[in-house]
Each structure stands twice: as structure tokens, then as C-alpha cells.
Amino acid sequence: EMIETLGMDVARRLFTRMGYQAGTYDAEMARKVRSKTSLKDMFVVGPQMHCLEGIGLSEPIRLEFDVAKGEHYGEFLWTHQVEDEEHVRHFPIGTEPSCWMQVGYASGYATEFMGKQILYREVECLSMGQEACRIVGKPVDDWGDEAAPDLQHLMPPALLGQAPSMAALAARAAVLPAEV
């Protein structure tokens, strides 16, 4: 419904930014809840909460980080992703990943935890015809030019000059069928 109402790009940006904010909040909470454990034990609270909240299963493939040095590399395999399963139920297999909120969450979580902008990108996705979703995260600078499209989805629309006007949103909503 969000995609039909707002369009693919605006919906993606909205979901990604919502996920990012949720991730930053959960990272703050993980630091408090696991304050007496190792940094790695603190960090893995995020993927554990991902599962406990019913979002999907998150299996670490590789996780290396050093907060003091600002180094981070994370790679996770996601299965049974609710967000993705809903997407493929309503849209055909395509060329773009669709776990927008969860990638935003991973980026926000890692960024808050590391104190440095970390970008997770979905490099394989069920909505692209793969068997599972795979994400890779590292500092934005380490991605180079590859990061630009994904970073756009983390920025407020007004900063991109793409904020839809109220008239445009009203026009889109006017063509939707009324709920009975």
C-alpha cells in the first residue's frame, strides 16, 4: 500500500529511514543491557533482536570490528524475512533488493554502535530471485562510489529536493480504491 500510495522511491526512503532510527535506538539499548559483556556480545544483540521481534532469522557469516580504530566488516545471511516475503507476494521478482527497513536498521545499529557512519547494503535478496538475503556492512568511505544510491535512501527527501508536495500525495491517494 505504501508503494502504491507514495511510489517506490519514496516508500523505500521512508522504510529505510524508519529502520535506521529503530537501529540506533536498539544499539543504545544493547549498550545498556549488555554493558558488562564484551563488545562483540553487545553488538550481536541487534541480530538477536531481529529474530526475537519476528522480523526474520539473521545468521552471521563474518563479523569483525574495532570500535577504537573505526574498522567494521559485517556480513549476514537473512532468511524468513517478513519484509521480503511480503514484497515478493505483491510484486514480481526484480533487480532491486527489498529489505529496506532491515538494511536501514542494520546501518543505524552499526553506526550508533561504532560512532561512525556504517552502511549495510543488501547484495543478495529473495526479491531478486536468490534463495536468501545477504547483507554486507562497512564504513561508508570503504564502499566508494557504490554507496551513493543507498545513501540517498538515508537522507531526508527535502535534502534531496525530492519531497513530494501535499498536492502530489493527495492526487496519488485520490486514485486509490476506497476501503469498504
Where are these regions (language model features)?
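N-terminal accessory segment detector
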Residues: E1-M101, G115-V180
